[in-house]
């Protein structure tokens, strides 16, 4: 799946495709969320192809689904179930920890489901900018709550405030996908994570899906539209040499 195919299916607009390309190339940490069948892995695969070809990338998956093309230094790791004796299991947590010793420039985790979320966030916070992952959630705000729960599974006893601060400093952008009533898969919202303030992680919606007058019960018509909110955290964009505004 390529970005061109996402454009053809109406999941994103050309403007959004260009913004995503800028964000990936500037090494923003991006989380993609949605329900079952919303196209998270497909979307992750598509935007992963924006990663510059000369970077060292490590992918971590339960089963190899990602097909990132053109990366010369790509290492693909897969989890392994325990054998009949209950030994030999290799978890996502194991692989994320191992990958950090392999000097990656980016880490792409197919999906976080449990305690490995803590290791993923720590990797994002310790110099592995540009990392990408997906998770099950019904909205961008719900993704934050689910991340909190998953981190608690990996670090029992860590204060909730510390967890929220960790999430806010690690994740730059959250993208929410959905499978709509006509079975089409659409990008519903793109939010910037602003930081942690007054006990809450602050989100800044940049794009939101808006249905138009042509929508019916059987067919959804609409597109992602700019909210009018300015994109605040442009530090990585400027650091990458990009002077365009988002």
Q: Where is each model-derived feature located?
A:
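NTP-binding/hydrolysis catalytic cores, primarily Walker-type P-loop NTPases
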Residues: 183, 187-246
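Post-Walker A helix-loop "phosphate-sensing" segment adjacent to the P-loop in P-loop NTPases
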Residues: 49-58
């Amino acid at each position: 799946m390529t970005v061109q195919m996402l454009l053809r299916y109406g999941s994103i607009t050309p403007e959004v495709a260009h913004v995503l390309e800028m964000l990936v190339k500037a090494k923003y940490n991006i989380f993609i969320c949605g329900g079952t069948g919303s196209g998270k892995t497909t979307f992750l695969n598509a935007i992963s192809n924006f990663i510059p070809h000369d970077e060292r990338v490590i992918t971590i998956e339960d089963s190899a689904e990602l097909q990132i093309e053109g990366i010369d230094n790509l290492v693909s790791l897969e989890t392994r179930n325990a054998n009949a004796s209950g030994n030999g299991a290799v978890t996502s947590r194991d692989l994320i920890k191992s990958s950090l010793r392999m000097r990656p420039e980016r880490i792409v985790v197919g999906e976080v489901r449990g305690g490995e979320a803590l290791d993923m966030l720590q990797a994002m916070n310790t110099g592995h900018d540009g990392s990408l992952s997906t998770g099950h959630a019904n909205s961008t705000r719900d993704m934050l709550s689910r991340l909190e729960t998953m981190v608690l599974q990996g670090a029992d006893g860590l204060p909730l405030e510390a967890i929220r601060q960790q999430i806010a400093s690690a994740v730059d952008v959250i993208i929410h996908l959905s499978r709509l009533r006509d079975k089409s898969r659409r990008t519903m919202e793109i939010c910037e994570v602003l930081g942690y303030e007054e006990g809450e992680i602050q989100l800044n919606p940049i794009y939101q899906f808006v249905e138009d007058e042509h929508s019916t019960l059987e067919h959804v018509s609409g597109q992602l539209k700019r909210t009018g909110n300015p994109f605040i955290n442009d530090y990585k964009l400027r650091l990458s040499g990009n002077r365009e505004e988002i």
